[in-house]
Structure formats: C-alpha cells, structure tokens
Amino acid sequence: MITGAIKNKVDKIWTDIWAGGITNPLTVIEQLTYMMFIRSLDEKELETEEFENMSGEKMDKIFPQSPIGQSMRWSKFKNNDPRDIYDVISQRVFPAIKNMKHGHLPDFTEQGEMIEIVDNTENDAEKDTAFARYMSDAMFLIPTPQVLQKIITGLDDLYEHDISDLDMQGDLYEYMLGKLSTAGQNGQFRTPRHIIKMMVELLQPTPEDAICDPACGTAGFLVASAEYIRSHYEDTMTNEQWEHFSGPMFTGFDTDRTMLRLSAMNLMLHSITHPEIDY
C-alpha cells in the first residue's frame, strides 16, 4: 500500500521534473517509466549474477560484458558526476533500450557507435515485439543533468527504503497514473485500481486463458490479471504455462502510441516480455 510518505517522495520527484520544464503529466510519467525500466534492468542483472555465484551456472546477461556495456548499468553510473550520468544515459543507455532485442542490450564501440544485435529469428512476428515497436520513436526529454540526478536519487530512495516487491511497484505506478485522472483529448480515462481488482477477481483468470483488453491504456487490467494469476497459480504453473504467461496470454489495443509505449514498459516491468500490444 502506498503511504503518505511514499506519495510525498513521488510528488517531490514530480515537482523536480515540472521545475525542469516538463509540465505534461503523460510526458512526466513516460520519462519516469524509462528511468524505472533502466533501473529494473540492472536489478535483474544483479539477481542473475547472484544466482550465478551461488549455482556456478552461466546465465544469459542483459548488459554487454565489455567495460562500455557495464558502464550502462544503474549501479555503475548513479554516483558519477551529473554531467557524466546525463551523457551515459542520453548517448548510450537510452539508445540501447530502444534497440533491445530478446532481453539483451546492444554494445557500443569506443567511438560511441552502436553495435547492432544480430537477429537470427526467422519469424518476423517474433522479431517485431510490442516493446521494440513502440520504443522505436521514444524520446529522452529530461532537460538537464541536475534534474536527471534528482530523479535518480529520488528513485533510489524509493526503491531502497519503500518499494519492496512487485505489488508495491504496481501501487507506485498506479499512484503516478492517478495524476492522469482527467480525460485526455482521445478520451483516456484511468480505471481506479479497486475497480480493476474487483473485475479481475470476478473473471478469475487461469494460466490457460487468453486475456484481451480492447482499450488497454497503460495495461492496468492486463497487469492486474497477471498479478492474480501469479498469486493463485505461481507454485503450480508448468514451463509451457510460464511461456504462455510471458507473452501470448496478454493482448491489448489502444489508439495512442504513447499509451501503448507505457503499456509495453509496464508489462515488461511485470515480467511480461512479449505481449500482443497494438493499434
């Protein structure tokens, strides 16, 4: 549950971004989501490294193993000079997440040129994931190194002291989305979280189902369905069911590319890597 203290911290980050000149709430959420996503990639990598150390088993890595690739990790750059952080994120990390393929980030040469990941997938549908489609025109709009440093410090404070699990992260995201409570030009409305939860509990989705939201917005219903399935079936799901869960189970449509981009990242943050998100 989001406490008053957590809301105050989120509001402080929000105010810092507004003071930097970004006043559109949707743009603020979009930029914050990028930063949350970048941080989550490093967290997943740290978990993988910990598992490797305990088991001795080699695992696939998200980040390239070169010095430049490792410099793109949140834990590596977060304490650097703000200007250096800004350069790393704007010139390497952000272009890298836009070109992420199959859970891997591309590397860069010493001259700063991206080394594209070779895609051996024959099926075009598998190449063109929702994440790749809607990140292709994403823009990094955080205006200054100082604003970026405040966002990084604020998010670190939240995650290290207040956000303990996926449920809490979802609540945090829902609180930010609550700032979009007025209808947009295209009639976007945010469904309150308790209504979403009630509807999902009435549906009682199972790991065998296919779930579609024809007006998905930021994928609130799809994420809630995923959380319901996890809480009721996580311990009994087969490998085939987990594979179904990671993508084909969830389909969403919307008319706004920004909302679709937020959907793809929201689902990715909840470990749904290949959803069917489209116009």
Question: Where does each model-flagged region fall?
Answer:
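Non-catalytic, mostly N-terminal accessory regions of nucleic-acid modification and defense proteins
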Residues: 1-207, 276-279
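Conserved S-adenosyl-L-methionine
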Residues: 186-279
